[in-house]
From Swiss-Prot:
Record PANTHER family: GRPE PROTEIN, GRPE PROTEIN HOMOLOG, MITOCHONDRIAL
Source species: Nitrosomonas europaea (strain ATCC 19718 / CIP 103999 / KCTC 2705 / NBRC 14298)
GO biological process: protein folding
Transmembrane segments: none
Name this protein carries in UniProt: Protein GrpE
Family assignment from sequence similarity: Belongs to the GrpE family.
Domain of life: Bacteria
GO cellular component, one term: cytosol
Function as written in the Swiss-Prot or TrEMBL entry: Participates actively in the response to hyperosmotic and heat shock by preventing the aggregation of stress-denatured proteins, in association with DnaK and GrpE. It is the nucleotide exchange factor for DnaK and may function as a thermosensor. Unfolded proteins bind initially to DnaJ; upon interaction with the DnaJ-bound protein, DnaK hydrolyzes its bound ATP, resulting in the formation of a stable complex. GrpE releases ADP from DnaK; ATP binding to DnaK triggers the release of the substrate protein, thus completing the reaction cycle.
Pfam family for this entry, one: GrpE
InterPro entries: GrpE, GrpE_coiled_coil, GrpE_head
Extent of Basic and acidic residues compositional bias: 1-14
Subunit structure of this chain's protein: Homodimer.
GO molecular function annotations of the record: adenyl-nucleotide exchange factor activity; protein homodimerization activity; protein-folding chaperone binding; unfolded protein binding
Length: 195
């Protein structure tokens, strides 16, 4: 008989075949835990995928709406620009109607004298000048000024006592709209004698 102190406690004793049983239990537990963990993780990934697909669809829908809105704004802007070009002189045209009315009234007058016709033409010219001023149309009348190719068109050059390249005669006045020449003044320019 063995003494009680010589015996190993039962828990620490190795029994034959115990290693195999412990190993099987341990690997089964680990495998079971892994399967359960995989089952728990899989729905989470599927759920995340569904949520991502929903968000992607929402973003795609918002993008399509923004694209359509941008296209509508572009078309509206093109229409507005075309309309602005088409009717740009609308207000100017209305102002010119008063000038036309004055000319019609002058022509409708019977037995008018030359003096009355002249007065009527002067009045009509003043009306037209007022319309031009209102719309920033300015006259280019360069008599005696230095020739400027940006505002004047030289029809001919004549020997003169004036300094070379001086406008000595205005054949037709020019006009500017704001700071843009809409018609250059047609002029005769001086040139040095003997050239």
């Amino acid at each position: 008989m063995q003494e009680p102190h010589d015996q190993e406690p039962i828990e620490k004793q190795k029994l034959p075949g115990m290693d195999d049983v412990l190993e099987t239990e341990h690997s089964g537990t680990v495998a079971g835990n892994t399967e359960r963990a995989g089952e728990d993780a899989a729905p989470s990934l599927e759920q995340q995928l569904k949520e991502a697909e929903i968000r992607a669809a929402e973003h795609h829908d918002a993008w399509l709406r923004a694209k359509a809105e941008t296209e509508n704004i572009r078309k509206r802007a093109q229409t507005d620009i075309a309309s602005a070009h088409k009717y740009a002189i609308d207000n100017f045209s209305v102002q010119l109607l008063a000038v036309m009315d004055s000319l019609d009234a002058a022509l409708a007058t019977e037995n008018s004298t030359l003096e009355n016709l002249r007065d009527g033409v002067e009045l009509t010219r003043k009306q037209l000048a007022a319309v031009f001023e209102k719309f920033n149309i300015h006259t280019i009348d360069p008599q005696g000024e230095k020739f400027d190719p940006h505002q004047h068109e030289a029809m001919c050059a004549v020997e003169s006592d004036f300094a070379p390249n001086t406008v000595i005669q205005v054949m037709q006045k020019g006009y500017m709209l704001h700071d843009r020449v809409i018609r250059p003044a047609m002029v005769t320019v001086s040139k040095a004698k003997g050239t």
